[in-house]
């Protein structure tokens, strides 16, 4: 059987992960305890491992990333067989979120900005901390995508779980592009993945 790993990445002790166990799957947790942080931003430190498993988990054919506050239930082999039988990357769709369904990164960006504006009225003393990320950076990134022809309503991932055959060429290219968008643009990774997938189609 091919080598398989389930992993998470946590910097800044936001979550306390429970070691996940599943037959035939190894467990890894990247954190400041075993990895040197490169950025002042803990979010980006964690995202680097989330997005780039081909750099850190080369010995594994399959990987499943999960957010640090999640638990694994069910058969992971069945999940991989179902969703990676003819693809190298699989996410859950944000449109399946019953409380907050969306299929468009542009709408997601506007929702983040609107929520920050609302919070700013309630707690102006918090300033930019009212926003999940810098609203000017988010808007600039969305303007760039629109200018490059990225269509609206072209799908929106939720990034809490990612299934990958991460050493495949198309997966590596898309993940490297995604990391550049997160590194130099918004740390809100769901804003940029669908653009990167569209760019690498």
Task: Give the residues covered by each predicted segment.
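N-terminal anchoring/stem segment of glycosyltransferases
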Residues: 1-62, 184-188, 199-201
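Structural motif
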Residues: 9-12, 68, 165
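Short beta-alpha junction loops
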Residues: 12, 33-34, 70, 94-98
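Short active-site loop/helix that positions an aromatic residue
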Residues: 54, 77-81, 196-197
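Short beta-strand-to-loop acidic/aromatic patch adjacent to the donor-nucleotide binding site
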Residues: 61-70
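Conserved donor-nucleotide/metal-binding helix-loop-beta segment in metal-dependent transferases, i.e.
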Residues: 72-115
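Low-complexity, serine/threonine/proline-enriched polar segments
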Residues: 104-132
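Catalytic core and acceptor-binding pocket of nucleotide-sugar-dependent glycosyltransferases
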Residues: 121-201
């Amino acid at each position: 059987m091919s080598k398989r790993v389930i992993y998470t990445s946590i910097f800044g002790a936001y979550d306390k992960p429970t070691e996940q166990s599943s037959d035939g799957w190894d467990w890894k947790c990247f954190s400041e305890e075993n990895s040197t942080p490169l950025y002042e931003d803990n979010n980006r430190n964690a995202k680097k491992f989330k997005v780039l498993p081909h750099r850190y988990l080369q010995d594994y054919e399959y990987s499943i990333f999960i957010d640090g506050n999640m638990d694994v239930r069910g058969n992971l082999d069945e999940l991989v067989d179902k969703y990676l039988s003819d693809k190298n990357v699989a996410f859950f769709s944000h449109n399946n979120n019953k409380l907050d369904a969306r299929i468009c990164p542009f709408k997601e960006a506007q929702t983040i900005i609107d929520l920050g504006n609302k919070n700013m009225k309630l707690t102006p003393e918090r300033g930019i901390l009212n926003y999940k990320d810098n609203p000017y950076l988010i808007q600039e990134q969305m303007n760039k995508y629109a200018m490059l022809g990225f269509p609206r309503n072209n799908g929106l991932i939720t990034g809490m779980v990612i299934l990958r055959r991460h050493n495949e060429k198309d997966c590596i290219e898309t993940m490297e592009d995604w990391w550049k968008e997160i590194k130099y643009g918004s740390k809100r990774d769901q804003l940029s993945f669908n653009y990167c997938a569209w760019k690498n189609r």
